[in-house]
Amino acid sequence: SETPKAAKPVDLMIFATKESGLRGAMETASGFIGENTLMLSVLNGVSSEETIAARFGERNVIYCTAQGMDAVKVGNALTYAHAGMIVLGEKQPGGISPRVQQIADFLNTHGVTAQPVGDMVRRQWGKLMLNVGINQTVMVFEGDYGTVQKPGKPREIMLAAMREVQKLAGLEGYPISEAEFDDWVNLADSLSPAGKPSMRQDGEAHRKSEVELFAGTIIRRAEKFGLDVPVNRWLYDTVKQMEAGY
């Protein structure tokens, strides 16, 4: 109930905004963040932790993904078939640290399913791979999860975009195995066919999407390796054209 001006440091700060709102949220939260405050970002992609670390230092940044949810928000009503879960861990691979376990226990105790892992950044690349495929494809084809769960052009585009991320992740030092690739595709296939990813909902509401966080990130990072990512370039250009028409 404290205002930012009267703030005192908290034990845990969770950032749960859109990418476009992160910097503003950090400024609002700055008074609540002290030298021992742990920070957790549930934003999509692989860059929000870097943004937070640049502002507050990386020592207390816990890496995280939110996955498996199929929520659809219309007005002020939120519906879902799968609530999903939080996966969290340290930046450096290894065991599960006491502070990560403590956060996971706290979340699980308060009704948020959380799983601590020892290979968090690689997990983030897997989630980014899924988002790059499913979010952008469903937006471009103006469909729902069911659109990419059946054979056809949309599914082919989704899988091709994911393959490009798989190649890039390996070059970045976070290889995604074929078995893991299949697991992410199976996760996509398990979502409610009538559900819609956040980018599709942004498109329907004529809001700017997170295409920079997805295809934009892939294109920029691929360039430093000389990796061609034509499917993501096509998705990026198509989404930008759609947004220009709002």
Model-derived features: positions:
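Glycine-rich beta-alpha junction loops
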Residues: N44-V46, T65-D70, Q92, M120-Q124, ...
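NAD(P)-dependent Rossmann-like dehydrogenase/reductase catalytic/cofactor-binding core
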Residues: N108-T109, I157-Y246
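Short, solvent-exposed beta-strand edge segments and adjacent coil->beta transition regions
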Residues: V10, A83-M85, S198
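Short, flexible turn/loop "capping" segments at secondary-structure junctions
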Residues: A6-A7, T79-H82, S192
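Rossmann-like NAD(P)(H) cofactor-binding subdomain of soluble oxidoreductases
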Residues: S1-A77
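Internal alpha-helical scaffold of NAD(P)-dependent oxidoreductase catalytic cores
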Residues: G31-F32, A54-N60, G75-A179
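A general structural signal for well-ordered alpha-helical segments in protein cores
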Residues: V10, L22, S48-E49, V100, ...
